[in-house]
Every structure is written in structure tokens, then in C-alpha cells.
Curated annotation (Swiss-Prot):
HAMAP family: PdxH
GO molecular function, one term: FMN binding
Lineage: superkingdom: Bacteria
Assembly notes: Homodimer.
Stored Pfam families: PNP_phzG_C, PNPOx_N
Protein name: Pyridoxine/pyridoxamine 5'-phosphate oxidase
Cofactor stoichiometry and binding remark: Binds 1 FMN per subunit.
Residues annotated to bind substrate: R9, R10, E11, Y12, K69, Y126, R130, S134, R194, L195, H196
Cofactor: FMN
Length: 215
């Protein structure tokens, strides 16, 4: 390393987050922040990239980067292989957490809640708009399984291409979407001297309770 980790820091001075300007509905604030990120974050950064955390049967957390592909009043939607490590973990423990970080805006959003599968129709609708290579890959890759080498993966893809040479691939039963139903959403805005703004929304009595947290 060319620089000490202990010396790596920056000041956050871009913006603030006050209760007076924050809506009572966290979905409204998320959409506002997401739109800001789309306008501000420079390519190749993906504003819809987020860290998804799940827990395995032994209680160990697992994190990976995924892309958010849907948002409505029910929750946050992403797609994956149901037989992958994350799919097996969600089948055993259907709870998860997401984190979005938009460094250009000095903002972070943390989301926690339960997870459900979307309908097959929703999965198929998204699958059909994916690039052909991605659709074939969903069939070819035994996600999270041990394989011998890259050549094996390429052989699996070649077999899949031959299989669907005369017809478009359909959405596999082992592939589809999940929707995270939030119970808690926290918005973090970087501020000077590490005295950051944190607004926490929690489900309560059919609505949302909003509270400020100490940084």
C-alpha cells in the first residue's frame, strides 16, 4: 500500500438532511435520492448497484453486489438464480438487508426486511427484456457450484446456445425475482466532523415512524 489506511479520510460537506425537508413516506425520499444519484453519479458507476446481505444456516452473513431492478409501494426487487447460495439462504431464512452508497452525493441508504419471491409472470417479464447473452447465461451457469475451470463454463454456454438455436430461451424455473419488503429504512447524509445526519424509518401500526439517530 502506498498510503496508510489510518490516514485515508475525507470531509463530507455537500448537503444536509433535516426532518423538516424529509417526507413521512421513506419510499418518496428513496425515489428522490435515487433520481439524484442517476443525475449525479458518473459512469461507469451504476446508481442501482447495492450490497445484499443474507445469512446462512450457521448464522454467518454473506454480502454481494447486485442491481436493483424494481421498486414500488411493496418493496425493492432484484433477480437471481434461486439455486444459488443466496437463493438457498433466502429459502431457509427469508430476511435480508440492502445498502446503497452514492459517494458523489455523500449518501447511503440501508434497508432491512423480509423477502418474498415475485410471481413467475414478473420474473418472465424481466427475463424477456434482458440481453440474449444474459438469458442464455441464466440457463448455462450452475451458479455458486464448483466447476473445474473457465473452459467448463464456456462448454456449458455452447451447449445452451445449441439447445436454443432454433427458439428463444424461456425463463428458467430456477431463475427469477425476489422482493424485499422493508421494515426499516435508514437514510444517511455525510456531514462535517463525522457528525452525519441519520433519519431512520420503521414500520409501526401500518405506517412509518421516523426518528433521528446519533451518528
Amino acid at each position: 500500500m502506498t498510503q496508510s489506511l489510518a490516514d485515508m479520510r475525507r470531509e463530507y460537506t455537500r448537503d444536509g438532511l433535516s426532518e423538516a425537508n424529509a417526507p413521512s413516506d421513506p419510499f418518496s425520499l428513496f425515489r428522490q435520492w435515487f433520481d439524484d444519484a442517476v443525475k449525479t453519479e458518473r459512469l461507469p458507476v451504476e446508481p442501482n448497484a447495492m450490497t445484499l446481505a443474507t445469512v446462512d444456516a450457521d448464522g454467518y452473513p454473506h454480502c454481494r453486489i447486485l442491481l436493483l431492478k424494481g421498486l414500488d409501494e411493496r418493496g425493492f426487487t432484484f433477480f437471481t438464480n434461486y439455486e444459488s447460495a443466496k437463493g438457498r439462504q433466502l429459502a431457509a431464512n427469508p430476511r435480508a438487508a440492502m445498502t446503497f452508497f452514492w459517494p458523489a452525493l455523500e449518501r447511503q441508504v440501508r434497508i432491512e426486511g423480509s423477502v418474498e419471491k415475485v410471481t413467475p409472470e414478473e420474473s418472465d417479464a424481466y427475463y424477456q427484456v434482458r440481453p440474449l447473452g444474459s438469458r442464455l447465461g441464466a440457463w448455462a451457469s450452475p451458479q455458486s457450484r464448483v466447476i473445474a475451470d473457465r473452459a467448463e463454463l464456456e462448454r456449458l454456454l455452447a451447449d445452451t446456445e445449441r439447445r436454443f438455436a432454433d427458439q428463444p430461451p424461456s425463463c428458467p424455473e430456477h431463475w427469477g425475482g425476489y422482493r424485499l419488503l422493508p421494515q426499516r429504512i435508514e437514510f444517511w447524509q455525510g456531514r462535517p466532523s463525522r457528525l452525519h445526519d441519520r433519519l431512520d424509518y420503521r414500520r409501526q401500526d401500518g405506517g412509518w415512524l421516523r426518528e433521528r439517530l446519533a451518528p
